[in-house]
Each structure stands twice: as C-alpha cells, then as structure tokens.
C-alpha cells in the first residue's frame, strides 16, 4: 500500500472515533464518498465506516435495505462488490429474486479539484423480469472509482471492484420517503369498526318520522316502531336495545298515568283545556 493510500485510511479511521453532537447527519457530497470512503475500501477490504453498511445487492430487495443500513432516515449507504455477469466482461448482474436494477440516464463525472476521481450511475428498481418489469419508486446511486483512481490504476491487492450505493425511495413530487413511513411494524391509526354514519337524507327522514310521536301507544306497538326506525336510521346503536326501550316505556307510562289522573272523567282528544292546541308529545327524542 502506498503512502497516500495509507494516510487516507488513517485519516478515515481517526474520523471513526469523533464524537459528533446530537443533530448531525451523515450527508456526504459525491466527492467525499469517493475520496474518504470508497477509495480506502478499495485499498483495504477490511476498512469499515460507521455510517456505511455492507451488503450483497443481488440477495436483498430494495424495500429490505433500510433495515440493513447502519444509519439513515431517508437514504441509506452500502459498500457492495459489483457482480460481473462474465469473468472477462464488463456487464454487471443487477438482478434480485423479485426484480432488477436498471440504469437510467447518463453517468455523472465526479471531480476532486480538476481531477476526475469517480462516476455516479443512477438506477431504478423494476419488479419482475425484463422486458416486462414494472417500474418502482426505488432509486439507487452507484459510485465507482474513475480517472486516476480507476481500478486499472490500483495495486493488485485491490482485486474486488467495490462500489458505494446510496438507496432511497422517491415520491412523485421528488421528495424522499422517510424510514418511519416504510416500517411495517409501526401501528398506524386505522378507522375503528363503528357503524357508518347516516347521510343527510337518512337523518332528515329519521328526524321527520320521530319529531312528533303519538302520546298514547301500547308497549308492543311502540317497541316494534322503535326497532323498525332504528334499522332505518342508527342501526342497533341505541333504540333496539331492550333495556333502553323498557326504561323509556316506563317513563312514558308514568307520565301518561299522571295525565290520566289529571283528566280523569274527561274524554281526551289530544287538545288542551281551550280545545284549540295540540299537546306536545310526552316522549319526543
């Protein structure tokens, strides 16, 4: 290992022991990923970083990657070894069990000063198999060494072609989906199993039919009417309850007995002493 590579490894190892205050996030630039993380990994396969995990992307689906990462809320970083389809070829195997990663757009050059040091490739995950794969909103940025750091210019000890992958899920508006919304174990608030509310027409119909209840009725007839109306209106929420019916009938009977005492000996025709106005219903709900 040459002096420059050795020095880079030492610097990065020193950074591993820095205690950062709360609130700091791992948000490196493209050049920082190449210079401070990918190059040391290529020179020393035992190199590790606090914020970057190590996975085989061909064995893990994108929606499982957030829980394989060391840290990250909206994007997750990994060291990966590119899986060549053929030993002497340049094509990379990007298939998983559920689908495949497909490159999109043109690779972006990454510079350190005026020197080309790396390239960034953008890929999108498709479910199924080409050419009938279904596009998802999972995106990956793959960083590789290039220019003076190109694999051809590295020592023979750098046998594996390491890359850094940044994975995230993208919304339609371009924003990234946070991990808290991806976690299948979070208990989201679901609507309770309550009876559906009435619409306006049902409510008006229910109110109209019960706004003036006949004052004199026997228990059997009244119970049947209430149960019938409850099915048309609020279901069995209140009025089909036998205890509720019994209590209200007892109240009505008590009130009516008082009316019978007051008007004993007089035929009751639903009018007051003046004979001009209708009595309000005793049981009006």
From Swiss-Prot:
Matching entries from InterPro entries are given as:
NAC-dom (IPR003441), NAC_dom_sf (IPR036093)
Give one GO term, molecular function aspect.
sequence-specific DNA binding
Q: State the UniProt keywords alphabetically.
A: Activator, Apoptosis, DNA-binding, Nucleus, Transcription, Transcription regulation, Ubl conjugation
Q: Disruption effect?
A: No visible phenotype. Delayed leaf senescence and flowering. Increased tolerance to various types of oxidative stress including H(2)O(2), salicylhydroxamic acid (SHAM), N,N-diethyldithio carbamic acid (DDC) and methyl viologen (MV). Impaired age-related resistance (ARR) against Pseudomonas syringae pv. tomato and Hyaloperonospora arabidopsidis. Increased seed germination rate under saline conditions and delay of salinity-induced chlorophyll loss in leaves.
Q: What induces it?
A: High levels during senescence (e.g. age-, salt- and dark-related). By salt stress in an ethylene- and auxin-dependent manner. Induced by H(2)O(2). Accumulates in response to abscisic acid (ABA), ethylene (ACC) and auxin (NAA). Repressed by high auxin (IAA) levels. Age-related resistance (ARR)-associated accumulation. Repressed by miR164.
**Where does this chain mainly localize?**
nucleus
- Which post-translational modifications are recorded for this protein? Ubiquitinated by NLA. Ubiquitination of NAC92 leads to its degradation by the proteasome during leaf senescence under nitrogen deficiency.
The coiled-coil segments of this chain are none
Q: Which GO terms describe its cellular component?
A: nucleus
Q: Where in the cell is it found?
A: Nucleus
| One of the Pfam families matching this protein, by short name | NAM
Indicate whether Transcription regulation appears among the record's keywords. Answer: yes
A GO BP term here is: response to ethylene
The DNA-binding region ranges are: 117-176
Q: List each copy of the NAC domain by range.
A: 20-170
Please list the tissues where expression of this protein has been recorded: Mostly expressed in roots and flowers, and, to a lower extent, in shoots and leaves. Particularly expressed in old and senescing tissues.
According to its record, what is known about the domains?
The NAC domain includes a DNA binding domain and a dimerization domain.
The function of this protein is: Transcription activator that binds to DNA in promoters of target genes on a specific bipartite motif 5'-[ACG][CA]GT[AG](5-6n)[CT]AC[AG]-3'. Promotes lateral root development. Triggers the expression of senescence-associated genes during age-, salt- and dark-induced senescence through a regulatory network that may involve cross-talk with salt- and H(2)O(2)-dependent signaling pathways. Also regulates genes during seed germination. Positively regulates aging-induced cell death. Involved in age-related resistance (ARR) against Pseudomonas syringae pv. tomato and Hyaloperonospora arabidopsidis.
Q: What else is known?
A: 'Oresara' means long-living in Korean.
- Quaternary arrangement and interactors, per the entry? Forms homodimers. Interacts with GLK1 and GLK2. Interacts with NLA.
| Protein's recorded name | NAC domain-containing protein 92
Q: Which organism is it from?
A: Arabidopsis thaliana (Mouse-ear cress)
Source lineage? Eukaryota, Viridiplantae, Streptophyta, Embryophyta, Tracheophyta
What gene name is given for the protein in this entry? NAC92
């Amino acid at each position: 290992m040459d002096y420059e590579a050795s020095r880079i490894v030492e610097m990065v190892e020193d950074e591993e022991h820095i205690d950062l205050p709360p609130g700091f996030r791992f948000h490196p630039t493209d050049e920082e990923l190449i210079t401070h993380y990918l190059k040391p990994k290529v020179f020393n396969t035992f190199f590790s970083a606090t914020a970057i995990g190590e996975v085989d992307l061909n064995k893990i689906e994108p929606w499982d990657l957030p829980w394989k990462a060391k840290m990250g809320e909206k994007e997750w970083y990994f060291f990966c070894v590119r899986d060549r389809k053929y030993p002497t070829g340049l094509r990379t195997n990007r298939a998983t069990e559920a689908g495949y990663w497909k490159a999109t757009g043109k690779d972006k050059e990454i510079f350190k000063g005026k020197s080309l040091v790396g390239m960034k490739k953008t890929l999108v995950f498709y479910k199924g198999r080409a050419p009938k794969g279904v596009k998802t909103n999972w995106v990956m940025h793959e960083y590789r060494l290039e220019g003076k750091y190109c694999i051809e210019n590295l020592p023979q000890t750098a046998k594996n072609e390491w890359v850094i992958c940044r994975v995230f899920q993208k919304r339609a508006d371009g924003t990234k989906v946070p991990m808290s919304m991806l976690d299948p174990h979070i208990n989201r608030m679901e609507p309770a199993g309550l009876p559906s509310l009435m619409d306006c027409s049902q409510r008006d119909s229910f109110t109209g039919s019960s706004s003036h209840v006949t004052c004199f009725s026997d228990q059997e007839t009244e119970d049947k009417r209430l149960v019938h109306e409850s099915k048309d209106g609020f279901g069995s929420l209140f009025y089909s309850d036998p205890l509720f019916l019994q209590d209200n009938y007892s109240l009505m009977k008590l009130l009516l007995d008082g009316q019978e005492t007051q008007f004993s000996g007089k035929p009751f025709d639903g009018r007051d002493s003046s004979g001009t106005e209708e009595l309000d219903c005793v049981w009006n709900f």
